Amino acid sequence: MNNKTCPNIVRILAVLFAGIFITTSQARTWTSTDGKSMQAIFMGIEGENFRFKMRDGNEIVVPSDRFIKADQEAAERLDLIGDDSFTKASARQIDTLLAGNLKEAGFSSFNEPLPDDLFVRRVYLDIIGRIPTKEEFLAFAESARPDKREALIDDLLLSPGYASHMFNYFADMYRLNASDAFVNGIRMDPYVQWWRDQLKANRPYNEMVSDMLTATGNVGQNPASGFLLRDTGMEFDAFANFGQTMLGIDISCAQCHDHPFDEWTQGDFYDMAAFFGNTQRSLGYRPAAAMMGGGAIQMPNAPEGWKKQFEDYAVKEHGVVLRDQSDRQFNYFVQALGWNIADNETLETVLPHDFRGSGGKPNDVARPKTLIGNAAKVGGKTRREAVAEWLTDRENPRFALVIANRMWDRAFGRPLVGPVTDFADSSIRGAGQPEALQFVTKEMQRVNYDLREFMRILYNTRAYQSIATEEEPDWGSDYAFQGPVLRRMRAEQAWDSMMLLQHGKEIDEKTGADGSFYKAVLDVDFNTMTNEKVWEHFEAWKQASGRRMGNAVLASEGSMTPTVVSDNDLRASELAQPYTNASMLDTFGQSDRVITDDHNYDGSVPQVLALMNGDVTERLTGLSSKVVEDMEEYDGPDDKVRGVFFTLLNRFPTKDELSLGTGMIEDFGDDGISDLAWALMNSPEFLFIQ
């Protein structure tokens, strides 16, 4: 052990032990109306009483009216999201760890603290993906609550917008694509909706990943199967994406040869891919992976002969002409039923004919072997179940580190170690903030992969609540995290903010097509349903076949009748995934969901033109726009100017800005309001998160 390594190891060990000793000694202080105080962890509200856990582990119940107003307000908030004693203690620990390395990086401390106006705009954009309304901005600016920042963070994390904005991130990460471009008429809407539902329920991330890796059936029977069906026919590409998203390892190079810059060999690639070797991704009744040998089962997850029996029934009872153009919808329906995931032990991963790596020879059968860490326990379970258990096990810190690092990147605009899809162990050891990286990895495990609670910790740090660093850090050097990096809005944030300006905060509650009809039609139990019952599903399928299928939802629960929902006035997360080419979302960089994390933040001429004279900008700042109409509630020109600034930039205007804006309104009336709104929307300040 050299002298340089030893202090780092000592510091990292100190970090790990620091996480253990966060106890009630860091608990919130609660104050009674007569001035007495106590330290305790809040457990919940029971009628007119508050329940607490004391230092000795005992729990007590105290009437709520015994506490000062600020504590009563805090209790109401914590009852919804949980006590924040550990949250704040963890946030303080992160700040301490970061601060310890700031001086080494040449900084005396964090960037300047974020003022209230920049804070409120940042947390709205970062947590729920849109700017605040002027009413939301003023409510925060005028609040005298001592815990107003913590309260706002919690309120936003509990709002529908949190899941909406988080969905946009994972849609990019997991390349969520609902279109029928995969196979004739086959869609992924139930899988996309599954992601929305999991995030709304705040499902632990490790459980979601386990569901995706072990799912069987089609997307109607089990929507999580969409993860593996996403790359049907490109199984090794699917495995490479698994490595990037869940392990932070890009091993795709090793499919053809030993990795030129890392330790992975061609044999490692196929050994790890072998965990998915028994996985049959099927189209109709044929395995999609031609490169994998073995026999096909006639209809995945169905009794022997089911497909032929149903087709014979359709021919005899309904005059269907199989594989004829006139009955193509019947063929599409059967194909969609059979587009599913099954475990087939006769399938194996075989080394390619030109295999040149060590550990085997061409056409050998690859045997499952993990890339890193402990071996997976294969006995008594499917290979996919084994790799899911290995991946999410607490003994595999890599999984926790990868998602913690990604969530950190969301908050700060830069990961602790990167890039997020591919970093070696040496990069972890050489990270600029190694103690913080180790600590947040442990925190992700401590909160049991509760992403909402993890983000709650990050948003409460002094580091996050600092002025953004304007100069983009060089990827070739370590960033010290003296504050978040100045970022441009994602395409979805810009879209949702503009929808807010046009329609108001009602957009937070509106939902679009949810895949419920498509899910119901394909949710066929081959073992129990009669041919007549399955035919009813096909009759329903025909009602919404073609382009209407993507917008079809169940008219009522329990029915098989479709109704079509409009995609007007919806947030980006509720639109078709991905949205149409040449739309504003596409113009501002929304991913086409082909490559992992392919969102584009670069500016472009079409973006400038869209903001300067596009149809959306006209609707937002024109004389009949909501922005101009809302200013009618203000009397004087100076109040109208403030109102426009509150609405678009969420801050008070400077003295010079107020004077200039007042002159515009005095000279041109509503045209002046419209021109001011147009100017603010086209300023860099509107699109950037400071």
Identify the residue ranges that each predicted region occupies.
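Long, His/Glu/Asp-enriched segments that create or flank divalent metal/ion-associated functional microenvironments
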Residues: 499-575, 583-589, 594-605, 609-612
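Compositionally biased alpha-helical segments
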Residues: 25-96, 102
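Primarily short, surface-exposed interaction patches in extracytoplasmic proteins
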Residues: 92-122, 126, 130-161, 175-530, ...
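Globin-like tetrapyrrole-binding proteins
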Residues: 170, 676
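An acidic intrinsically disordered interaction segment
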Residues: 86-88, 370-376, 562-580
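Bacterial N-terminal signal peptides that target proteins for export
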Residues: 2-13
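Metal- or metallocofactor-binding catalytic centers and their adjacent structured scaffolds
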Residues: 164
